[in-house]
Amino acid sequence: MTHAHITSWFIMIILFLIAVSMQRSGAAKANIIKMVLRLFYIITIITGLLLLHSIASISGLYWLKALAGLWVIGAMEMVLVAGKKGKSMAAGWTQWVIALVVTLFLGLLLPLGFDLF
C-alpha cells in the first residue's frame, strides 16, 4: 500500500504542475487535467487512510502528517482557484511549499517511510 500511496501523490504533484501551467497558458483542456487531479486527490487520501489504519500504534506524528497531507491538497486548490480568478497565487504557492516540505519530512522520518533521517 505504501507504493500505491507514493505513486499517487507523485502523480498528483505532476498533474498539479501541469494544471497550473495549462491554466496560465489558457489551454482549453486545463479543466480535464484538473478533474483528473481531483481524482488523484481522492486516491491519495484513500491510500493514506488505509496506511494510517494499518498502523498498530498511531502516534501524534502520524496524525500531524495526515493533516499536513490534507494541507498540501488544500494549498493546491488555493493555487488553482486563485489562478482561475486572476488573483495572486503567492500565498497558495507559499503554503504549498511549506506543507509539502513538512509532509515529506514527516513521511521520511516516520517508520513507514524510507530511512533517510
UniProtKB/Swiss-Prot annotation:
It holds the Pfam family DUF1516. The keyword Transmembrane applies. Keywords: Cell membrane, Membrane, Transmembrane, Transmembrane helix. Signal peptide: none annotated. The keyword Electron transport does not apply. It is a multi-pass membrane protein. GO terms for cellular component: plasma membrane. It is found in: Cell membrane. Its main location: membrane. The chain crosses the membrane at residues 1-21, 39-59, 61-81, 97-117. Belongs to the UPF0344 family. This is UPF0344 protein GTNG_0604. It comes from Geobacillus thermodenitrificans (strain NG80-2).
